[in-house]
Amino acid sequence: MGQTLTEKIFSAHTNKQVSAGEIIESPIDMVIGNDITTPLSIRAFEESGATKLANPDGFCIVMDHFIPAKDIASANQARISRDFAKKHQLKHYFDERDMGIEHAILPEKGLVLPGDVIIGADSHTCTHGALGAFATGMGSTDLAYAMITGKNWFKVPPSIRVVFKGKLQEHVYGKDLILEIIRQIGVDGALYKALEFQGDTIEQLSMDDRFSLCNMAIEAGAKNGIIAADSITKEFLASRKSLRAEPKYYQADADALYEQTIEIDVEKLEPVIAYPFLPSNGKSISQAVKDDLKIDQAFIGSCTNGRLSDLRIAAQILKGKRVHPDVRLIITPGTQQIYKDAHQEGLIDTLLEAGALISNPTCGACLGGYMGILGDNERCVSTTNRNFVGRMGARSSEVYLANSAVAAASALKGKITDPRKL
């Protein structure tokens, strides 16, 4: 019997044929921590008596949740990671001087590669599956174990094959593909399974859209989301200044055993809006327009949709116009490099002239930490990945998940708007 893409990667790392359901211990190529989760890992690392990282070049800390510090507590917490990075002379450490959201900056820096096994103490580590890697989130103690040993244990997940067919309509993106699959299968429809994305739609999808797609695999309960590397992947890698190692390319076998195959024709797919309070509560933009949903805030950013293409989409829609007077539009570039590139393209000026607020790269608004918190009964259309009760602020606030075009168009009109109708 053939193997799925996830099984292929684990087999290569363990030097044996593995299949779904097996418990294995695998070497880790990249271990990722951030300013919130790494301090707990550092504590466990030091309490174990460890003094050296098993693989210093395969460990990365990204300060992205509360950086610059939002208060004294977060400033003190950040010092733990900073001191550890300095003590161990970490090569891959990203702070205020070269900052970015972890799941945007690692691909940008060439630190995650096809064929890798990647773990991170952040649930959206699955983003990196867009590059053809196995990538999943774990807890801080699991991270500490990998810091000490360079390995971790896994139960090889069964795979669901998701085949997207057809050409996407204007202003329908990778974000809409993942919101549609979550709408169909629910937030636990892929519980501890690999979502392997295939089809001619995927073959035409940009890397930025692939990152958005894989980013939200966890919102369906998936262990990981993954796309086989192809010419688009290779073009992306070729544009990096350097790569951590040589990529390893794998493809699923034609006779691979999948637990389920889901086929979706995207030809008639509209932009999808996930209503409160679950990412699975998806409705079409046409329905959202009928519901006449006035908004207080629009947010464009996060590890889901804070890439250069998202800023280009927003600038195209907002150019020469002004944000509705009742709406706050907050835009958070995913990395400093994205910010710089957007500035060089004139996007930042366009967005500022439209009335947007441009923040530093941060996860702050997405998790209701800072830089975009919602007050009582406020409503936000957001390009983030979660819309649980109180996710971005007050428990009575509402978050509607959407793509960047919808968020920008809605900011203009003061209510959730179909960007295709502008």
Swiss-Prot record:
EC number: 4.2.1.33
Keyword Metal-binding attributed: yes
Cofactor binding remark: Binds 1 [4Fe-4S] cluster per subunit.
Swiss-Prot/TrEMBL cofactor(s): [4Fe-4S] cluster
Catalytic reaction list: (2R,3S)-3-isopropylmalate = (2S)-2-isopropylmalate
GO molecular function, one term: 4 iron, 4 sulfur cluster binding
Family of the protein in this entry: Belongs to the aconitase/IPM isomerase family. LeuC type 2 subfamily.
Subunit note: Heterodimer of LeuC and LeuD.
PANTHER family, A to Z: 3-ISOPROPYLMALATE DEHYDRATASE LARGE SUBUNIT 2 (PTHR43822:SF16), HOMOACONITASE, MITOCHONDRIAL-RELATED (PTHR43822)
Function: Catalyzes the isomerization between 2-isopropylmalate and 3-isopropylmalate, via the formation of 2-isopropylmaleate.
NCBIfam families (alphabetical): hacA_fam (TIGR01343), IPMI_arch (TIGR02086), LEU2 (TIGR02083), PRK00402.1 (NF001614)
Entry protein name: 3-isopropylmalate dehydratase large subunit
Gene source species: Wolinella succinogenes (strain ATCC 29543 / DSM 1740 / CCUG 13145 / JCM 31913 / LMG 7466 / NCTC 11488 / FDC 602W) (Vibrio succinogenes)
Lineage: Bacteria, Pseudomonadati, Campylobacterota, Epsilonproteobacteria, Campylobacterales
